[in-house]
């Protein structure tokens, strides 16, 4: 390859692979992360993930599992006001492919609903206080397989995102992730 073309590719290509760095504030709960080991390494496991938690980090890593795997995580935020829960299950289909499922929930429970606190006569009635929850959910399903070369793995992840804020509001969303891993063992 000519040096000028190589220089151009090295200059332009990194602009397209910054998908992990782009953030917005919608569904920010999906950026918290899973797996204590991965979080302890400052989330630098995208290229090396090869277990059930690959459904979150890089679905291509699911090809690395040999047997059924499960993962459960719980974390409390803001002195226990908010809770983050994660559960995942993965299994190999054959030597070349695997499938996984996961659910993530980030929620605040037992929020006081005071919209009915004052009755029609303007009196405060504490019996009208009720509780509600505000929660975000992500349901994921992933498939991964070895491609033409045994060293090249490909994975895809489809997710459905659900937000529920008591009886006041709810919404649905969806997304897709794709990942590749190349491992060269000489």
Predicted features by range, described:
Residues 1-22:
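Bacterial Sec-dependent N-terminal signal peptides
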Residues 20-186:
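Subset of outer-membrane beta-barrel
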């Amino acid at each position: 390859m000519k040096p000028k073309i190589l220089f151009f590719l090295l200059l332009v290509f990194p602009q397209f692979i910054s998908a992990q760095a782009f953030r917005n504030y919608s569904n920010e709960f999906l950026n918290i992360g899973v797996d204590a080991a991965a979080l302890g390494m400052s989330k630098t496991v995208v290229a090396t993930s090869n277990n059930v938690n690959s459904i979150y980090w890089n679905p291509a890593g699911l090809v690395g599992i040999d047997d059924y795997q499960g993962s459960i995580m719980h974390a409390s935020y803001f002195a226990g006001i908010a809770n983050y829960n994660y559960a995942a299950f993965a299994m190999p289909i054959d030597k070349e492919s695997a499938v996984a499922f996961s659910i993530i929930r980030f929620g605040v429970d037992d929020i006081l609903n005071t919209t009915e606190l004052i009755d029609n006569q303007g009196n405060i009635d504490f019996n009208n206080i009720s509780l509600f929850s505000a929660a975000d959910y992500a349901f994921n399903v992933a498939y991964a397989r070895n491609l033409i070369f045994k060293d090249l793995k490909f994975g895809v992840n489809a997710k459905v995102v659900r937000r529920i804020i008591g009886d006041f509001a709810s919404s649905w969303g969806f997304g897709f992730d794709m990942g590749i891993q190349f491992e060269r063992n000489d």
